[in-house]
A protein has these predicted regions:
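Pre-Walker A (pre-P-loop) alpha-helix and adjacent loop at the N terminus of AAA/AAA+ ATPase modules
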Residues: 13-69
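Basic, amphipathic alpha-helical bundle interface domains used for macromolecular binding and assembly
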Residues: 44, 48, 223-382
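Canonical AAA+ ATPase core
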Residues: 63, 84, 116-119, 130-143, ...
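Walker A/P-loop
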Residues: 55-99
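Short glycine-rich substrate-engagement loop in P-loop NTPases that contacts/grips substrate
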Residues: 97-127
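Short loop/turn elements that form and flank the Walker-type P-loop nucleotide-binding site
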Residues: 51, 58-60, 71, 125-127, ...
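Interdomain "pre-motor" coupling segment immediately N-terminal to P-loop NTPase/helicase cores
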Residues: 1-16
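C-terminal engagement/docking regions of AAA+ P-loop ATPases
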Residues: 64, 69-79, 303-478
Length: 478
């Protein structure tokens, strides 16, 4: 498998760090995460659950993994953390939080130091950079807010003190609804960048599944040292992280050689990979597709709706005035779309482009990650896309995929016009605002023509913006 990637590297001048990520993916797929996705569900031939989980580890994202119990939600995260971040599985397990109706801050965030009441003893979960929260939806709604800021920004607070945790990936698992769990609140769901689903494996793989052995990803000696570092009282958090990093690099190098996947990542290489991903530019069509998606999240006529409502029959683009193929986002989705959504979409589209050794983020990279950034955040209108998958496990993800297909088709049908619009609205490199407005206003008549020919909110939004800017600019000139 490594030889295959080396040949690809020679043919495509492949990024060496992306090559390592591909090799780690193959290792986990072949040895620790057996799956059988349908071909139509794959991302460029790869299992989406495993691939997105790997990207989460690399970019320090926040991921919610849903599925029935016993489907490998937690163990897959532990294996990825071991290979990417160098934390043995037994150390990760000792630091995990677990959903509990009676959960308290003292269990997983901090406790007072009884020898010095001005001091706190921060819990392992709060300190360890890669975090796993098992069965997150076992917590009552009132308890979920205890972890809101920790998930969002890595800040853990207790008794007027704050621990700013070292950045790392955050994995939470969620079982499908049963008598023991509760609904995760929408603001909490919005904190998760992506969500994936683990499913039952094809029975024909039973022999392989029974032979999976992840003991190589454990190390009792290194795990004990890591836990001792986290439990040490009086040592600065920065020093603890430095000591953890040294142990993690040693463990990661050791298991990578044992598994035959080369040297694996070092901590410095992971930081470099994140910087490379951050600096990948969007191709114009990729950027324009993001703009197109954004234009479908708010109605140009009525603005934003309250949660639980979609733009209805009294709206020009509402549910009563559009067929299924042309029904835009705000008429199909009953949940508000936040700025976090677009940041998550951009981050994972960039990560996918980097992993696939592409130099720019295309519309296809955005399309491929969109369902996984969207489905856990939104509710679809009751009459929208129920269809044959109404009772299937993961129907929300299936609906998000259907929605993605339809919005992508709407974009590609008018791509040439939208690319023209994007070019007209794109700010020049010299940031000359007056020149930018003049260029956009010169395009105003063409936008009006497009708005009449192709009835889509993106043109209505553009006309509104240019009309207001034009009026403001004329007032200033006077």
């Amino acid at each position: 498998m490594i030889l295959k990637h080396i040949k690809n590297a020679e043919a495509k001048d492949e990024n060496k760090l992306a090559l390592k990520a591909n090799t780690i993916y193959d290792c986990i797929r072949d040895r620790f995460f057996i799956s059988s996705p349908r071909e139509e569900d794959t991302i460029d031939g790869r299992d989406p659950t495993l691939l997105i989980s790997l990207l989460t580890a690399i970019i320090n994202g926040k991921q919610l993994t849903a599925g029935n119990f016993g489907r490998g939600k937690t163990t897959s995260a532990e294996a990825i953390i071991a290979l990417v971040h160098g934390i043995p599985c037994d150390a990760t397990m000792a630091c995990e939080a677990r959903g509990d109706p009676e959960i308290t801050k003292e269990e997983y965030i901090a406790i007072p130091d009884l020898t010095n009441m001005n001091n706190l003893l921060w819990r392992r979960f709060a300190q360890m950079p890669p975090k796993v929260f098992d069965e997150f939806n076992r917590m009552p709604s009132a308890k979920q807010s205890l972890f809101l800021d920790g998930i969002d920004r890595g800040n853990f607070e207790y008794m007027n003190q704050t621990l700013r945790a070292e950045p790392g990936p955050f994995y939470a698992t969620m079982n499908w609804p049963d008598r023991g769990n509760v609904e995760i609140l929408p603001p909490m769901l919005d904190r998760f960048d992506v969500s994936v689903i683990t499913s039952a494996i094809n029975p024909m793989y039973h022999k392989i599944m029974e032979e999976v052995d992840r003991s190589i990803l454990e190390d009792g000696v290194i795990a004990a040292k890591m836990l001792a570092i986290l439990d040490a009282n009086g040592e600065s958090y920065q020093k603890k992280i430095a000591e953890l990093t040294e142990l993690a690099d040693a463990f990661r190098a050791s298991i990578s050689m044992q598994l035959g996947i080369g040297e694996g990542f070092t901590s410095k290489e992971l930081a470099t990979a994140r910087e490379e991903i951050k600096n990948i530019e969007y191709a114009d069509t990729g950027d324009n597709f993001k703009l197109f998606i954004r234009s479908e999240t708010i109605c140009p006529t009525h603005g934003e709706y309250m949660p639980g409502k979609a733009c209805g029959g009294d709206c020009h683009w509402g549910s009563g005035n559009a067929n299924e193929e042309s029904r835009v986002g705000f008429a199909a989705i009953t949940s508000p779309i936040s700025e976090r959504f677009f940041k998550s979409l951009s981050a994972y589209a960039k990560a996918l482009a980097w992993y696939l050794n592409e130099k720019e983020v295309s519309k296809d990279h955005v399309r491929l990650v969109l369902p996984y950034v969207l489905w856990h955040r939104v509710q679809f209108a009751g009459d929208f896309m129920a269809g044959e998958n109404k009772y299937r496990v993961g129907k929300q993800l299936e609906n998000a995929k259907d929605f993605t297909k339809k919005i992508f088709n709407r974009f590609t049908e008018q791509e040439e016009r939208i690319n023209e619009l994007g070019e007209a609205l794109r700010e020049p490199e010299d940031k000359n605002r007056k020149e930018h407005l003049a260029k956009a206003r010169a395009f105003f008549a063409k936008i009006q023509k497009y708005a009449n020919e192709y009835d889509h909110p993106i043109f209505a939004h553009a006309l509104q913006m240019l009309g207001k800017q034009g009026s403001a600019n004329e007032s200033t000139d006077k």
